[in-house]
A protein has these predicted regions:
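N-terminal acidic leader/helix
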Residues: 1-42
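Mixed-charge, Lys/Arg-enriched low-complexity segments
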Residues: 34-70
């Protein structure tokens, strides 16, 4: 299971996504408009695109849990 945080930026700072493991250690940090590249760069496997679609659908400012096996 991983934890996903979607952070709303400001006028000068873009929106970001954080992906954290079960211990809430940071696994990935990338811009919200570059999800596919951010996942690849951080070696997070998303062959079916479920994680990418989940990130796009969640609102900003809350922590969400994502089970990679579902």
């Amino acid at each position: 299971m991983i934890h996903i945080l979607k952070i709303k930026g400001t006028d000068k700072i873009p929106d970001f996504v954080q992906i954290r493991d079960n211990n809430l250690s940071l696994r990935a940090y990338f811009r919200a408009d570059q999800i596919e590249g951010g996942l690849k760069k951080n070696n997070i496997n998303d062959e079916q695109g479920k994680l990418m679609e989940y990130i796009k659908s969640i609102p900003f400012g809350k922590i969400f849990k994502f089970n990679e096996n579902e």
